[in-house]
A protein has these predicted regions:
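Feature marking well-ordered beta-strand scaffolds used for ligand recognition
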Residues: 1-204
Length: 204
């Protein structure tokens, strides 16, 4: 039997029973020196959870929010200064509420949504994953209202979003695998006969 080596558990928080954390985890230091661990949830009903881990032996929940729809998930987030970006993806194409939310977390106990990039569309499941580490640009794997894939499995592409003004995010660029979009001149890429999970972007 394997044993834990050179590590020990010093504390635990059950997140009020909602432990379905996805890819979105970010340790944020506030201006007054507190360390807040923000986490995004893989499925409804919860959206984001913030835990004060300044005292590692005594983690305390500061905030836990609810998703707007039961078909959404918020499995990715990124933070710079007091601005947090959250990805919203739906279970099925065409469902409401998908895109990228922008929050002011200056008050860690009351995240305030100040902006939103809507990527809802008939073939879109919204934003799956985002990456934002510096500068004005966020990098998304997402669908959109104006992107129709030839195969529904190819519904996510690479989008660059200008978030310099967090209240008004604007698309700055995009790329997709040539041949996967309706209207492309290129032929559709070959599909794997057994393991075809799509020619779509997972992480940006």
């Amino acid at each position: 039997m394997q044993e834990i080596k050179n590590m020990r558990l010093i504390s635990h928080h059950d997140l009020n029973g909602f432990g379905n954390i996805g890819e979105g985890i970010h340790l944020h230091q506030t201006n007054d020196g507190k360390r807040i661990l923000y986490m995004a949830h893989e499925s409804a009903p919860k959206d984001i959870t913030g835990i004060d881990v300044s005292d590692l032996r005594n983690p305390k929940m500061l905030v836990q929010t609810d998703l707007a729809y039961p078909h959404l998930r918020s499995n990715s987030l990124s933070i710079i200064d007091d601005i947090m970006l959250v990805a919203y993806q739906s279970l099925e194409p065409g469902q409401a509420g998908t895109g990228m939310g922008i929050f002011d977390i200056g008050n860690p106990e009351e995240p305030k949504r100040i902006g939103f990039l809507d990527t809802t569309g008939p073939y879109s499941r919204g934003c799956h994953c985002l990456w934002w580490v510096d500068g004005p640009y966020a990098h998304l794997s997402t669908g959109s209202a104006d992107f129709q894939p030839r195969d529904q499995k190819d519904d996510q592409f690479y989008m660059i979003v200008d978030v310099e003004n967090p209240e008004r995010p604007v698309e700055a660029g995009r790329w997709w695998v040539p041949g996967t979009r309706e209207g492309d001149d290129e032929p559709m890429p070959k599909r794997h006969p057994q393991f075809d999970s799509g020619h779509r972007l997972h992480n940006a």
